[in-house]
Curated annotation (Swiss-Prot):
Residues 51-147, 173-192 are annotated as: Disordered. It comes from Byssochlamys spectabilis. Transcription factor that regulates expression of the viriditoxin biosynthesis cluster and viriditoxin synthesis. GO terms for biological process: aflatoxin biosynthetic process; positive regulation of transcription by RNA polymerase II. This is Transcriptional regulator VdtR. One of its GO terms (molecular function) is DNA-binding transcription factor activity, RNA polymerase II-specific.
């Protein structure tokens, strides 16, 4: 017999090259050189694979309790353990079902694998009059068969649900129990509640009743949120309203700010009817009185309360600058006629005598200067309460905002008062010169 031309067994190589395996990187498994070794100009070598057959754990999984002779076609020498706490007849009956006859101890491992698995043993109280042909029984039908008490699986699971659990349903018609339980929402109410965004839900907490002016200015449409009336009480001898012990200062300060925005409603501007000087001065005076009362309130304040209160003061100061026709030159938009508020100046009259425009402007400036000086005390109290101590019952993240607002109000108010005093001094000098 000639052995010429006979090739030996093919050597199995590793799937990844030695260099990629050592560096723990993915190998393209190209032979004779992988892509990584070819790009790096390095020698690529595939060593011999040391794996023979399946891994030991995968090969011996599930066979730890079986004699090795079984793998070679032998018989199982290890006896099956009897079922715990069950009579011998029940154990024997559990292994006598199937298509190929009873289970025996001399069966080979291949015969065991070819036989259908018996159903799980249900104990001695299980019904013994069950069908012997379990291979033809559907598994889903088996688990939904009625047990010894005549209950299905769903009925048995319902007994495990506590009585306190209630499932809320939303039928098309109104339920009778909704009258007894008003907390249950109908389907339409639930859909409306679910359609609200997080922004609207958060804004609804602090939005005032008269927030329509703000929303009209910002969005040009109706108010997004309508809140119930804020409970308030009137001080004796005072025209401004002060909130009670059950009030919400944040909502009250939002209402106060909304009144200033309602002075210049978009509907009035479109029709060409701007607010008069008297309307603006009255709105500013009422807003500062309410702001002073809210600032002196001893209740716990929300983190956004100082911000809204500072914006209110800045808004009042802006309206005063409109009245005296004074704008900040540092703001570029202030010089644009379409980007600033406009009012309708009305001459001042004493009975039948009407003052001229120059004298009316001087008297209006005197009145505004008096209110601005009174506003200085408000700004000073604001700075002492919210800007002096950054760790005084407030989050540290908002302290810079409070101090920025306080510095802005002090600077802008001081510059406005100084310019207005210079204007009045020049008017007095010119008026005295004309008289002399």
């Amino acid at each position: 017999m000639s052995w010429q031309g006979h090739e030996g067994p093919k050597v199995k190589l590793r799937s990844a090259c030695d260099r990629c395996s050592a560096n723990k990187v993915k190998c393209t498994q190209e032979k004779p050189e992988c892509e990584r070794c070819r790009l790096l100009s390095l020698p690529c070598n595939y060593s011999r694979s040391m794996r023979i057959g399946k891994p030991p754990k995968s090969r011996q999984r599930g066979l730890s309790n079986i004699d090795p002779k079984t793998l070679m076609g032998g018989t199982v020498t290890k006896k099956l353990r009897p079922c715990p706490s069950a009579p011998e007849s029940a154990c024997r009956g559990s292994f006598e079902d199937g298509d190929g006859g009873p289970w025996t101890e001399t069966m080979t491992f291949e015969e065991m694998l070819s036989r259908p698995s018996p159903p799980p043993f249900a104990g001695p109280s299980h019904n013994s009059n069950r069908p012997t042909n379990m291979a033809s029984t559907n598994q889903d039908q088996y688990y939904h068969d009625k047990g010894k008490h005549g209950e299905t699986m769903d009925e048995m699971l319902q007994t495990l649900v506590p009585d306190s659990v209630q499932f809320i349903e939303f039928p098309n018609t109104a339920r009778e129990d909704q009258k007894q339980h008003p907390e249950l929402r109908s389907e339409e109410e639930y859909s409306d509640y679910r359609s609200k965004s997080l922004f609207e839900e958060g804004l609804a907490r602090i939005a005032p009743d008269c927030a329509g002016g703000i929303m009209d200015v910002l969005y040009g449409e109706e108010a997004l949120v309508q809140m119930p009336n804020l409970p308030s009480s009137t001080h004796e001898g005072s025209s401004n309203t002060h909130v009670t012990s059950s009030h919400n200062c944040t909502r009250a300060v939002m209402e106060n700010l909304a009144k200033l925005y309602q002075v210049c409603a978009p509907a009035g501007v479109e029709n060409g009817s701007h607010p008069t000087t008297d309307q603006v001065l009255k709105a500013n005076s009422d807003a500062m009185k309410d702001a002073a009362d809210l600032l002196a309130c001893p209740c716990a304040k929300d983190f956004c309360f100082p911000i809204i209160l500072g914006i209110t003061a800045c808004r009042v100061l802006a309206w005063y600058q409109v009245v005296i026709d004074m704008y900040d030159p540092e703001i570029p938009m202030a010089t644009m006629p379409t980007a600033r508020e406009d009012i309708k100046h009305c001459p001042i009259a004493f009975g039948a005598y009407q003052l001229d425009e120059e004298v009316s402007q001087a008297m209006t400036s005197q009145f505004v200067l008096r209110n601005l000086r009174a506003m200085t005390r408000f700004v000073k109290t604001y700075v002492e309460n919210f800007c002096s101590d950054i760790n005084k019952n407030r989050p540290g993240s908002c302290s810079l905002i409070y101090r920025s607002l306080g510095t802005f109000m002090q600077t802008r108010l001081g510059n406005t008062i100084e310019q207005l005093e210079d204007r009045l001094a020049a008017f007095d000098g010119e008026y005295t010169k004309n008289i002399g």
